[in-house]
Amino acid sequence: MLRGDSAAKIQERYAELQKRKSHPTSCISTAFTNVATLCRKRYQMMHPELGLAHSCNEAFLPLMAFCGRHRDYNSPEESQRELLFHERLKSALDKLTFRPCSEEQRASYQKLDALTELYRDPQFQQINNFMTDFKKWLDGGFSTAVEGDAKAIRLEPFQKNLLIHVIFFIAVTKIPVLANRVLQYLIHAFQIDFLSQTSIDIFKQKATVFLVPRRHGKTWFIIPIISFLLKHMIGISIGYVAHQKHVSQFVLKEVEFRCRHTFARDYVVENKDNVISIDHRGAKSTALFASCYNTNSIRGQNFHLLLVDEAHFIKKEAFNTILGFLAQNTTKIIFISSTNTTSDSTCFLTRLNNAPFDMLNVVSYVCEEHLHSFTEKGDATACPCYRLHKPTFISLNSQVRKTANMFMPGAFMDEIIGGTNKISQNTVLITDQSREEFDILRYSTLNTNAYDYFGKTLYVYLDPAFTTNRKASGTGVAAVGAYRHQFLIYGLEHFFLRDLSESSEVAIAECAAHMIISVLSLHPYLDELRIAVEGNTNQAAAVRIACLIRQSVQSSTLIRVLFYHTPDQNHIEQPFYLMGRDKALAVEQFISRFNSGYIKASQELVSYTIKLSHDPIEYLLEQIQNLHRVTLAEGTTARYSAKRQNRISDDLIIAVIMATYLCDDIHAIRFRVS
């Protein structure tokens, strides 16, 4: 029989072999440590009591005699032999009496058992251990592990968001029966009690996207997540796909290094064929690392978590393999990438901004509200609202911005800031709700009971076009009035010249005057007319159009007619309006008013050039729908346009925008009698 010190040495030797990367296949179970032997088969024997042992044990007669004396031959006498008890023990047992359990006590125990069922669940214990170890790592508790782990770590909000996405989905799929109770525990642990149930449900989605600026620790944070999941989640399968092989190999080595130096004493860590596995003696937890050039390696896998790093630069052919895991209800796919807006091919994930469910998470130094103003200011390096802050290890100033743009124009916004230019450009300026409300809700301006609430002044804006090309441009005319804090459209005209042989000024003036006279005839409460004729194209023609309109209107009505006046090159006030930088301000003001429901149309809207073929409001809505913002280059002022390729021009919407813009009292001083 082996002595005690020999058994201890064998046990120690066996533990060393287990920790090695490759240990002999002849290692037997630790259940028979006293008889473990690594000798050749010719020297081995199989004994009923000792199991697999060295044949030299047959020479120890006391050992053989002991085994023979206590050998179990399954004889009936052994099972029927009477057990002997001490008399005092028998008398003490006879005096024991048991009281029946009351119903209240039984119900209390059942309730307590139901409440503690979650905490006894093995899957919950795995999640709880993961949370405990991760918190310990954040607090710097692993002092003997990887360099830097001894320091306390403060997570960025997107990193905490990523961690919540991972653990929430695993909790729901691992413990579906107790999912609600697990989520309540996680909500308390992450201190996100302020979130609504709708926001909580986002964490349980099968796919999510994170767009984060460069150098913010995206890949760095993935490494501890994979490591601690392998340690605590028994049987989990993780996939990691990178855009380059050297990136996936780097993450593989870092995960292996962390696993071996953090918890290799308790578990066997193995690295084979780009797969890191940890043996939990009941099941293995594995993590496979691949590049987008070898996505065939992830085919046929049964991942619970699939991390796609730098997803914007993944080969499009590889996405077919990755997206195939969406059909698996136990797989969570997380796309992580840096924000890059240089070309459409490297920012295709921004299309998810218009997805019916929230799955796009964008981190930027500049919020979307101030992005365009930030772009127009050449020296700005921080958002005006200061809602988003940069980490301490990121240094941004005007010199960095200038230097980056000197190497490559626009590099600061595209590569460093991580702007959301593509998202903002694709964002619709006019909401669907406001367009539907504008189309359906129209006021009756002939209702005599409402005369006292309508404004008494009619504003008309005329944008003349001296061409017969219907695809290029036409004359837009809009008549707008006030109703309390809202604006009413009384008339719309979109006029095109038939040919260049006729007098363009006369034709345009007659069209506008005809509409104005009709509006004034239908609405007798209007007692003042203010007209602005755009003179950017031809100032002389604009003055002549103004004179012709005044002559036609005053010959039919006795209303007071005022024109917007602008000084010409000789500093003489002339009846025309010059559109300049205030166009962008007017458009932004119109968008705000339209989306807020302050722009309405009259049921008795007057139109002689549109009504014959279209509903004037639907015709106007087509141009409103095309309204978009165009940013030419960084440092330049953005402009707005409603022109689209192969679509109608934007003359009518510009006339409506400027008419509502000139309704403000600040412009009243510019209207005078001509």
Curated annotation (Swiss-Prot):
Q: Per its UniProt entry, what is the enzyme's top EC class, as one word?
A: hydrolase
Mark the transmembrane ranges: none
Name of the protein:
Tripartite terminase subunit 3
Motif range for Walker A motif?
A: 212-219
Localization recorded for this chain is: Host nucleus
Q: What exactly does this protein do?
A: Component of the molecular motor that translocates viral genomic DNA in empty capsid during DNA packaging. Forms a tripartite terminase complex together with TRM1 and TRM2 in the host cytoplasm. Once the complex reaches the host nucleus, it interacts with the capsid portal vertex. This portal forms a ring in which genomic DNA is translocated into the capsid. TRM3 carries an RNase H-like nuclease activity that plays an important role for the cleavage of concatemeric viral DNA into unit length genomes.
Query: What UniProt keywords are attached to this protein's entry?
Result: DNA-binding, Host nucleus, Hydrolase, Viral genome packaging, Viral release from host cell
| Disulphide connectivity of cysteines | none
Q: Which Pfam families match?
A: DNA_pack_C, DNA_pack_N
Q: Which family does it belong to?
A: Belongs to the herpesviridae TRM3 protein family.
Q: Where is the active site?
A: E310 (for atpase activity), D463 (for nuclease activity), E534 (for nuclease activity), D651 (for nuclease activity)
This enzyme's EC code(s): 3.1.-.-
Domain of life of the organism encoding this protein: Viruses
* Residue window of motif Walker B motif: 305-310
In residue numbers, the region (Required for interaction with UL56 and DNA packaging) covers 580-600
Q: Which GO terms describe its biological process?
A: chromosome organization
A GO CC term?
Answer: host cell nucleus
Main location, first listed in the record:
host cell
- List, alphabetically, the Gene3D superfamilies matched: 3.30.420.320, P-loop containing nucleotide triphosphate hydrolases (3.40.50.300)
